[in-house]
Amino acid sequence: VCTPIAGKLTPVPRTATFERPVSGGDALLSIGSLLIGAIAVVAAVVLLVGVFDLNWVLGYAIPLATAVFAVALWQSLSRRGWTWKDLQLTSGPRSLWHLLWEVPVAWIAAMSVGIALAGAVDIAPASDAGGSASTLDALDVGVVAGTLTIACTVLIAPVLEEVLFRRVIFGWFDTRTRWQIAVLGSAVCFGAVHVLPAIALIMVCIGSAAALLVRLHRSLIPGIALHTMNNALATAAVVASI
C-alpha cells in the first residue's frame, strides 16, 4: 500500500502482529519438531507392540507424542534465541475480557461454516474427529492413561499447536505478506495436519478464527483459548458417549 508524499509514492509501514519476526529457519525447525513427535509415536508403537499390549501402547500414544513435541519445539526455538517473551503470551492492546464473548462466538461461527462447507462438498465428519479413538483407547487402558490423554488434549496440545501454527507459521506469513493471507495460510497448514478431509476443512475454519483473534489482540492467548475450548468440547463429547 502506498501514499503520495511530495509527488512520490512511499510505502505505508504495516503493523506486525508480533514483536519478533519469524525467520525461515525458525519456521523449518518448528515444523520439524512436529514431525519428530509423529515419528516418535510411530517408532514407539512399532518397538513396544511386541512387548506390551497394543491397546496399552495406543493408550499412551498422545501423552508420548505431546511430550516429544513439547521438548522438540522448545529446543528448536531456544536454539534460535527465542525466549518466553517472544511467544507473546501476554495481553495486547485489547482487553482479554473480550474473550468471554469473542471465543464462543468465533467457535460457533467457525464450526458452522466448517460443517456447512463439509456438507456442500459432500464429506461427512468421521467418527474419529479430534482423535476420539485415541482418547477411547486411553480410557480403556486405565485412569492414568485417560487422565494424561485428556490433559494433553485439552490443556497442553493447544498451547504447543498455537505456538507452532499461530506464533510461528502465521508469524512467518505475517512478516512477508498481508495479514489476511497469513490467516488463511496458517489455517490451511493447521487443517492439513488433521488429514481426514471433513475434519481438516473444519480445522481450517477453526484455525482462521484463532488467527483472527490473535491478530485482533496482538497476543497468542486468544488462539490458545479458542483451541482449548474446541478440544475440551470434543473431548467432553467423547467421554459422554462412553
What are these regions (language model features)?
Residues 85-87, 134, 188:
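Flexible, active-site-adjacent loop/turn segments at secondary-structure boundaries
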Residues 1-115, 119-123, 232-242:
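N-terminal, membrane-interfacial amphipathic/helix-forming hydrophobic leader that caps
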Residues 122-125, 177:
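Glycine-centered loop/turn motif at secondary-structure junctions
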Residues 108-112, 138-242:
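Transmembrane helix-loop-helix hairpins at the membrane interface
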Residues 124-131, 163-166:
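Short, structured loop/turn "capping" segments at alpha-beta junctions
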Residues 130-140:
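Perimembrane loop-to-helix junctions flanking transmembrane segments
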